[in-house]
Swiss-Prot record:
<dbReference type="GO" id="GO:0031647">
    <property type="term" value="P:regulation of protein stability"/>
</dbReference>
<dbReference type="GO" id="GO:0005525">
    <property type="term" value="F:GTP binding"/>
</dbReference>
<keyword id="KW-0690">Ribosome biogenesis</keyword>
<dbReference type="GO" id="GO:0005730">
    <property type="term" value="C:nucleolus"/>
</dbReference>
<dbReference type="InterPro" id="IPR006073">
    <property type="entry name" value="GTP-bd"/>
</dbReference>
<dbReference type="GO" id="GO:0005829">
    <property type="term" value="C:cytosol"/>
</dbReference>
<dbReference type="InterPro" id="IPR023179">
    <property type="entry name" value="GTP-bd_ortho_bundle_sf"/>
</dbReference>
<dbReference type="GO" id="GO:0042254">
    <property type="term" value="P:ribosome biogenesis"/>
</dbReference>
<feature type="region of interest" description="Disordered">
    <location>
        <begin position="1"/>
        <end position="58"/>
    </location>
</feature>
<dbReference type="GO" id="GO:1904816">
    <property type="term" value="P:positive regulation of protein localization to chromosome, telomeric region"/>
</dbReference>
<dbReference type="GO" id="GO:0005654">
    <property type="term" value="C:nucleoplasm"/>
</dbReference>
<dbReference type="GO" id="GO:0031334">
    <property type="term" value="P:positive regulation of protein-containing complex assembly"/>
</dbReference>
<keyword id="KW-0547">Nucleotide-binding</keyword>
<feature type="region of interest" description="Required for nucleolar localization">
    <location>
        <begin position="9"/>
        <end position="35"/>
    </location>
</feature>
<feature type="binding site">
    <location>
        <begin position="173"/>
        <end position="176"/>
    </location>
    <ligand>
        <name>GTP</name>
    </ligand>
</feature>
<dbReference type="InterPro" id="IPR027417">
    <property type="entry name" value="P-loop_NTPase"/>
</dbReference>
<keyword id="KW-0175">Coiled coil</keyword>
């Protein structure tokens, strides 16, 4: 038995519990009965880090020199190619072959013009059918520059064949882009078929309180038509009011607005509503679904997406802005048609180019003028053609088509339909009113009662305008049968005058104390603000802006009151005429 003091004793080298430490490397095998000598492996060869860095620097320097030599050789080779005439001719031939190949591919794929797909066209036609079904009166909007080109006879035939005895009215929009004499001729031509109303939509970009001018279209001057205010709304509302009165409508009517893309359907609705109720733009296809807009408690407007008629020429479809300009595969051909139809002198003056003989020369000059280039520094005729088409559809290039010399009634219309439409809308009364105003037309320019002016001056013009005679007559319980001369009460302000200069307004005797508040000189207001303490100028400016907003609201209230007074006066005159006739 082991003693306790020997129990934890470490075993010695010769004891039984001692293990011999083995050599970490394997023992060499015996060769020919003799034990081989063991070789201890030596440490690897040590390489200094600077040797690797120097080697890499040498390789990089050699690579940079090789690349520099290759670039110099490529530049010299390119320089030699440019110097030779043969290489230039070969480059021209290569580009011509590429262009011809591109034309062949376009013709094979039938990519001109790129209209909407079949599903989209069916969806638009479905929305059009819904508008026709729900409407009592259909307003077909036409472009005054080309009314017959924008007129869709298939659409009119579908409206006349629909159930419910639908009524159809033509609206000649964009009359500010056509001379006044041409507009009158088109009105006389179209009124032989259907009731026609001249109209100009508002071109303002604000959301509310769109301006509307009460001056009749026949009486408005050229400068007045070029303003941003709306024209023809009163006449159109009178036509719809005649339908409600003669048709004995007890509740309300729905008025559908249809037509080709980009003829101004949504702009017409916004002008009647005097607010931005529908999205508008110079690109076709913005309106995709039927939209209902409440005009008042008697009239509801239905906006429909534009429809492109089936049998139509490709170039004509593009020139009527029925296709996106940026999606055209070949915009050069429509530009060639424009140069054939329009006055070349006006186009040359507009773009500042002259002396061109072909369409290619014209587009190259326009590309040089506008800076339209492509890769290689060459002028892009495609981009120049798209820019010309964009100016065409936006109305910057003036053009119009005169009405035909002889009138022929379309096949889908008959004498009975024309007579019925005339009696329902009482067009003869409207034409007689226009003739009376033409007789009272003075030699001077018309007044811009609700044009694009400052709110202070707008209120001054409203208070001085002859429309106050109607309001005074209604207050005195008298009947007004005819609106007198609307000219000569205030001068036409220069809307392009810069700064805070005074407007030349003919101040007549004022019966309202509001005029003294509105006729404050704006220069004196600024002068008072500048004379105040610099620490209080911000507060003074905020107070001036607050007063300006107050004047704007006051002018809007007066405008609405005067418009209501005018409509009630016209109703009184119509009832008086009926009583005299009885």
């Amino acid at each position: 038995m082991m003693k306790l003091r020997h129990k934890n004793k470490k075993p010695g080298e010769g004891s039984k519990g001692h293990k011999k430490i083995s050599w970490p490397y394997p023992q060499p095998a015996k060769q020919n009965g003799k034990k081989a000598t063991s070789k201890v492996p030596s440490a690897p060869h040590f390489v200094h880090p600077n040797d690797h860095a120097n080697r890499e620097a040498e390789l990089k320097k050699k690579w940079v020199e090789e690349m520099r030599e290759k670039q110099q050789a490529a530049r010299e080779q390119e320089r030699q190619k440019r110097r030779t005439i043969e290489s230039y001719c070969q480059d021209v031939l290569r580009r011509q072959e590429e262009f011809e190949h591109k034309e062949e591919v376009l013709q094979e794929l039938n990519m001109f013009p790129q209209l909407d797909d079949e599903a989209t066209r069916k969806a638009y036609y479905k929305e059009f059918r819904k508008v026709v079904e729900y409407s009592d009166v259909i307003l077909e909007v036409l472009d005054a520059r080309d009314p017959l080109g924008c007129r869709c006879f298939q659409m009119e035939e579908a409206v006349l064949r629909a159930q419910g005895n639908k009524k159809l009215v033509l609206v000649l929009n964009k009359i500010d882009l056509v001379p006044k004499e041409v507009v009158e001729k088109w009105l006389d031509y179209l009124r032989n078929e259907l009731p026609t109303v001249a109209f100009k939509a508002s071109t303002q970009h604000q959301v509310k309180n769109l301006n509307r001018c009460s001056v009749p279209v026949d009486q408005a001057s050229e400068s007045l038509l070029k303003s941003k205010a709306c024209f023809g709304a009163e006449n159109l509302m009178r036509v719809l009011g005649n339908y409600c009165r003669l048709g004995e409508v007890r509740t309300h009517i729905r008025v559908g607005v249809v037509g080709l893309p980009n003829v101004g359907k949504s702009s017409l609705i916004n002008s009647l509503k005097r607010s931005r109720a529908c999205s508008v733009g110079a690109v076709p296809g913005i309106t995709k679904f039927m939209q209902e807009v409440y005009l008042d408690k008697f009239i509801r407007l239905l906006d429909a997406p534009g429809i492109v008629p089936g049998p139509n020429s490709e170039v004509g479809t593009i020139l009527r802005n029925c296709v996106h300009v940026q999606k055209l595969a070949d915009p050069v051909t429509p530009v060639e048609t424009i140069l054939q139809r329009c006055n070349l002198e006006e186009i040359s003056n507009y773009y500042g180019v002259s002396g061109f003989q072909t369409t290619e020369h014209f587009l190259t000059a326009v590309a040089h003028r506008l800076g339209k280039k492509k890769k290689g520094g060459l002028y892009s005729q495609e981009q120049a053609a798209k820019a010309v088409l964009a100016d065409w559809v936006s109305g910057k290039i003036s053009f119009y088509i005169p009405p035909p010399a002889t009138h022929t009634l379309p096949t889908h219309l008959s004498a009975e339909i024309v007579k019925e439409m005339t009696e329902v809308f009482d067009i003869e009364d409207t034409e007689q009113a226009n003739e009376d105003t033409m007789e009272c037309l003075a030699t001077g320019e018309s007044d811009e009662l609700l044009g694009d002016t400052d709110p202070l001056e707008m209120e001054i013009k409203l208070l001085h305008s002859p429309m106050t005679k109607i309001a005074d007559a209604i207050e005195n319980k008298t009947t007004v049968y005819k609106i007198g001369d609307l000219t000569g009460y205030c001068t036409n302000p220069n809307r392009h005058q810069m700064g805070w200069a005074k407007r030349n307004v003919d101040h007549r005797p004022k019966s309202n104390s509001m005029v003294d508040v509105c006729s404050v000189d704006r220069r004196s207001v600024l002068q008072r603000i500048m004379e105040t303490d610099p620490l209080q100028q911000g507060q003074a400016l905020a107070s001036a802006l607050k007063n300006k907003k107050k004047m704007q609201k006051r002018a809007d209230k007066i405008a609405s009151k005067l418009s209501d007074s005018m409509m009630s006066a016209l109703d009184l005159s119509g009832n008086a005429d009926d009583g005299v006739g009885d």
